[in-house]
Design a protein with these regions (language model features):
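N-terminal intrinsically disordered/low-complexity leader segments
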Residues: 1-7, 196
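Amphipathic alpha-helical linker/stalk segments
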Residues: 3, 56-83, 120, 128
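Helix-turn-helix
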Residues: 11, 15-53, 57
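Amphipathic alpha-helical segments that line or abut small-molecule/effector binding pockets
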Residues: 14, 77-106, 117, 143-150, ...
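Amphipathic alpha-helical segments used for helix-helix packing
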Residues: 55, 91-110, 159-167
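C-terminal peripheral helix-coil segments that are non-catalytic and often amphipathic
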Residues: 89-93, 121-133, 151-152, 158-196
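All-alpha amphipathic helical-bundle segments outside canonical DNA-binding/catalytic cores
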Residues: 114-115, 132-148
Length: 196
């Protein structure tokens, strides 16, 4: 029976995603990833190289999944609200992405920085064009607006204990999840709505 290369790679990436999200790049070992996947460590090295390369692969894949899930780039303030809502939904369903980003920030290296920078600049350019057309508020720089929208959607997952202390509920309560999403959408729209 032939070796299932794609299935093996998928299992290794799933195990690596879970390990890196739980322990960060410094606290994760290749041996633990291989053990979690049920695949020998040598195959892990063969497919992904070293631990840093694997972390970068995992994070890049997770960011690609987010981008595909929340596309397209919004241009009006209502669209920005729904973009923020879709981003919130995705991150609530996939909290490992926010954890991976936090670990990346703590570790100092940036995975696929040139491509990610280009991706974010493209969003900021679309916001800038909408600001020039009067569709979006121009009080904030487009770069700051993009960052703030991402932060609105991500912070609930980044600090769930703070959200629980403030609201008395966690995101497993469907009504609370809906309230949080509505707050994210409303706040994003208010940030982007022209004030004139």
């Amino acid at each position: 029976m032939p070796w299932d290369t794609e299935g093996t790679r998928r299992r290794l990436k799933e195990a690596a995603t879970a390990e890196f999200a739980e322990h960060g790049p410094d606290g994760t070992t290749m041996a633990r990833i291989a053990e979690r996947a049920g695949i020998n460590k040598e195959r892990l090295y063969k497919y992904f190289g070293d631990k840093q390369a694997l972390f970068e692969t995992v994070l890049t894949d997770e960011l690609d999944k987010l981008a595909a899930s929340v596309a397209p780039v919004p241009s009006g303030f209502e669209e920005i609200g729904e973009f923020a809502g879709r981003t919130f939904d995705y991150q609530a369903a996939h909290p490992q992405l926010v954890r991976l980003l936090l670990w990346e920030g703590l570790s100092g290296g940036v995975a696929d920085e040139a491509n990610r920078t280009a991706h974010y600049k493209k969003k900021a350019q679309a916001y800038a064009a909408a600001q020039r057309e009067g569709v979006l508020d121009d009080e904030l720089s487009p770069e700051h607006l993009v960052f703030m929208i991402i932060g609105l959607a991500a912070w609930w997952v980044s600090a769930p204990q703070l959200a629980r202390m403030l609201t008395g509920l966690d995101d497993s309560d469907p009504a609370e999840h809906a309230r949080r999403r509505a707050s994210v959408v409303s706040a994003a729209e208010r940030l982007a709505r022209p004030r004139r």
